[in-house]
């Protein structure tokens, strides 16, 4: 949650997406955990090898379900509060624009792909 969103409202929504994806038995597919797992800076691009790396933090691997084995950073109080009080939405996808800090949420995979195309 901490690394995916910059403000409290977005953090609560990211927390909700994580909860919903776990509830639906979907992989989390979060880039931030994948970067941590392969020890790359987020300014670098993840390669196909990185995305397929079978490390315990790579939530992009399709067969990886649930949370990583441990935290990827120290959470702020805002992130802890967001996890304890997630937003009430049905979103299951989000795209975080690391340049602007904007986070785009949707419950539609095609719309998520459009966010990725527009802001990625």
Q: Across the structure, where does each feature detected by a protein language model lie?
A:
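Bacterial extracytoplasmic/cell-wall-associated proteins, especially those involved in peptidoglycan
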Residues: 1-120
